[in-house]
Amino acid sequence: MSWYSFGNDRSLLILKLYVQPGARQTEAVGICGEELKIKLAALPVDGKANRALTEFLAKRFNVPRKNITLKRGEQSRHKVVEVCQSSNGPEVLFSEMRAE
């Protein structure tokens, strides 16, 4: 099983994420088991970490925030997120890691 999968028509990308809030910067850091680990600069207070996550994903996938849906894990570090209608694949999350 992978940390991502596609819906039936490939316009839906489903991501399994492990989120670490309170980091120095927001970034994807690598695979952790069957999830992609993402560090968030935001703290997990009043939904700020979830908002930071959706903003990060929307920017990476070049879609509006409304196309990012948190399906599971609103109050957990383990999350399932759906990305709708992105022309980018899951590899865009690693673009910053390769640049370093």
Curated annotation (Swiss-Prot):
Disulfide bonds: none annotated. SUPFAM superfamilies: YggU-like. InterPro entries: DUF167, YggU-like_sf. Pfam families: DUF167. It comes from the Bacteria. One of its GO terms (cellular component) is cytoplasm. Belongs to the UPF0235 family. This is UPF0235 protein NE0395. It comes from Nitrosomonas europaea (strain ATCC 19718 / CIP 103999 / KCTC 2705 / NBRC 14298). The lineage of its organism: Bacteria, Pseudomonadati, Pseudomonadota, Betaproteobacteria, Nitrosomonadales.
